[in-house]
Amino acid sequence: MIDCRYYQQNECRSCQWLEIPCSQQLTEKQYHLKQQLISINYDEAQWVAPFQSNQQGFRNKAKMVVSGSVERPILGILKNPNDPQSAIDLCDCPLYPTHFSAIFSILKDFIGRAGLVPYNIAKQKGELKYILLTESIATEKLMLRFVLRTENKLPLIRRELPKLLEKLPHLEVISINLQPQHAAILEGEQEIFLTEQQFLPENFNGIPLFIRPRGFFQTNPKVAAGLYATAQQWVAEFPIYNLWDLFCGVGGFGLHCAKALQEKWGKPIKLTGIEISSSAILAASHSAKILGLEHVNFQSLDAASVIENKNENKPDLVIVNPPRRGIGKELSEFLNQIQPHFILYSSCNAMTMGKDLQHLTCYKPLKIQLFDMFPQTSHYEVLVLLERKKIN
């Protein structure tokens, strides 16, 4: 069990399963997963042993609510979002890398120097709402974002920035996110960059990826790298030359699979990636260029748009990595119609995935594996490889 004083003192209970042994956590998650898939026939599927995570220091990202005063800022959580007195400082949270604590200390000093008054949601006063810190495990570089109510403190921030960079030379990306609403909303629409670099370079399994502000990226790098590597291994067994990556984000799944397939079969691989975020598409396209993948087309579209495009060359493999709501009945039925040989489904919500698999009536599961992306909680990631059923 992790030695966490915040949990022991009942200050933070985000890790609801902290007192449950790691082996039991995995057993319960595996049982839960099988219950969600009980309505589909997985008897012939290969159940791969769960991919385990480190139990502490595994997070590459910290989301810190800023409270307290400008002279004594508190970085952590508010147990009651409307009560600044309920603030808990989580700078020594054991889920973060140990060196984050020293970084937070430097940032507290910066808050005072730049006059960034912590926002008080009850009084609707103040400027600084959150500090968001992300680290690349490949480069050890950092992305730092200040979520502010207004631009009023921007001149002071710019004035103090050189001193901050002296103390934290690994800062690669620094930005201001403006969130003017008087509500406990994490971030707003506008991002102001204070550095030339706007993406944080990362690398999993030799695949360059780019973390962007306001974009989704897994917070457990070790398990995320394992998830992508597993996807690579599973699909490389088959002669796949045309794949779609729906909900592709910055291209993690599609790029891993395309690279592995090209190396295995020695032929150009056609990859089409669909993602609603234009900045994610820019990042994915940049990664593909670095890898030298030529037959790649990343498009900023809603994943549902593929249903309307009937003229696309039919894929051999479709990768889906949807948000918690799943892919839904309409997209499931579309996949039944176009019948790719394989579907690779990655999910953070086994319940909605189970419903989707019921709709994918033309497919049977070949392989299933749980990934312990979120230790100390009931949450997990799951990867399923589906094969088109043979018609008798």
UniProtKB/Swiss-Prot annotation:
One BP annotation, GO: rRNA base methylation
Cross-referenced Pfam families: tRNA_U5-meth_tr
Binding site for S-adenosyl-L-methionine: Q218, F247, E275, N321
InterPro entries: 23SrRNA_MeTrfase_RlmC, MeTrfase_TrmA_AS, MeTrfase_TrmA_CS, SAM-dependent_MTases_sf, U5_MeTrfase_fam
Keywords: 4Fe-4S, Iron, Iron-sulfur, Metal-binding, Methyltransferase, rRNA processing, S-adenosyl-L-methionine, Transferase
Function: Catalyzes the formation of 5-methyl-uridine at position 747 (m5U747) in 23S rRNA.
NCBIfam families associated with the record: meth_trns_rumB
Assigned protein family: Belongs to the class I-like SAM-binding methyltransferase superfamily. RNA M5U methyltransferase family. RlmC subfamily.
Protein name: 23S rRNA (uracil(747)-C(5))-methyltransferase RlmC
Annotated organism of origin: Haemophilus influenzae (strain ATCC 51907 / DSM 11121 / KW20 / Rd)
Taxonomic lineage of the native organism: Bacteria, Pseudomonadati, Pseudomonadota, Gammaproteobacteria, Pasteurellales
